[in-house]
Amino acid sequence: MTDAGSWCLIESDPGVFTEMLRGFGVDGLQVEELYSLDDDKAMTRPTYGLIFLFKWRQGDETTGIPSDKQNIFFAHQTIQNACATQALINLLMNVEDTDVKLGNILNQYKEFAIDLDPNTRGHCLSNSEEIRTVHNSFSRQTLFELDIKGGESEDNYHFVTYVPIGNKVYELDGLRELPLEVAEFQKEQDWIEAIKPVIQQRMQKYSEGEITFNLMALVPNRKQKLQEMMENLIQANENNELEEQIADLNKAIADEDYKMEMYRKENNRRRHNYTPFVIELMKILAKEGKLVGLVDNAYQAAKEKSKLNTDITKLELKRKQ
């Protein structure tokens, strides 16, 4: 794998991934964070794929059957720091739905790379100026880099995706030679039920080592689906019998608008350079003799929060056993 070059690290956040879809020109999709695979009401259907972030460790192996089937679009990760975009694009290339439009950037990439081998596909992806520009639009603005000794390296965090193709579920990991077949499901079965034990096993393994992870789902654009439902209800509401349902849909659409606006604001904050402000604030606090105490308090609070989150995850996994 080549050096990071001009690819930046980006956060594992549904707002980042959803806006990245918009940047690529994708229509009909969004990304949602999942806190549990057991809460069916909280999951949007259909779910086109899952994106799993975990801390990669030497020797970690996933049980599965390597597959070189031609109907799976798979590209290697050939450059560091691009694993988030790599995972998302590997997933998008395998979505087969007429309601989903990939847009010019990804359609051109797919048409060019479809007949290439996985490694060459990866090089084509990492050399795409348009894809890199969208990826780097989420870079954190800073005047310098801090080398914090003893901290966890962001480079060790890695994304993989799970995608249903035919009646099999595959793990697409750009660091592997081939996709892995990790589950099988019947035609009438929800593929999420088939992959659930695999993901829960990985979550349990990583939580035991106090290693953070998160899970996101690629799902239909909720606002578009709600608007389609609204149009159907309005057409069927000849006797004003569906006013309550229409009101509920209006509220759900407003909630989606609010969520997307929050995503936009958070992404703008990510792009803003706060360094001059922080430096000036630290100077003032140091001059007043408050800086060391505040840093110590913040460090202890962060440790306690991390321990609490780990304990909650362990309890949740034990409850499911």
From Swiss-Prot:
Disruption phenotype: RNAi-mediated knockdown causes a slight decrease in lifespan and in brood size. Enhanced proteasome activity, specifically in the intestine. One of its GO terms (biological process) is regulation of chromosome organization. Residues 6-220 form the UCH catalytic domain. The keyword Zinc-finger does not apply. It comes from the Eukaryota. The active site is at residues 83, 158. It holds the Pfam family UCH_C. GO terms for cellular component: cytoplasm. Keywords: Hydrolase, Protease, Thiol protease, Ubl conjugation pathway. It catalyses: Thiol-dependent hydrolysis of ester, thioester, amide, peptide and isopeptide bonds formed by the C-terminal Gly of ubiquitin (a 76-residue protein attached to proteins as an intracellular targeting signal). Its EC number is 3.4.19.12. Gene3D superfamilies: Peptidase C12, ubiquitin carboxyl-terminal hydrolase (3.40.532.10). Highly expressed in intestine and to a lesser extent in other tissues including muscles and neurons. PROSITE patterns: UCH_DOMAIN, ULD. The record marks 173 as: Important for enzyme activity. GO terms for molecular function: cysteine-type deubiquitinase activity. The keyword Oxidoreductase does not apply. Induction: Expression decreases with age. Residues 273-301 form the ULD domain. The record marks 77 as: Transition state stabilizer. Ubiquitin-protein hydrolase involved both in the processing of ubiquitin precursors and of ubiquitinated proteins. This enzyme is a thiol protease that recognizes and hydrolyzes a peptide bond at the C-terminal glycine of ubiquitin. Interacts with proteasome 19S subunit rpn-13. Belongs to the peptidase C12 family. This is Ubiquitin carboxyl-terminal hydrolase ubh-4. The lineage of its organism: Eukaryota, Metazoa, Ecdysozoa, Nematoda, Chromadorea. The gene is ubh-4.
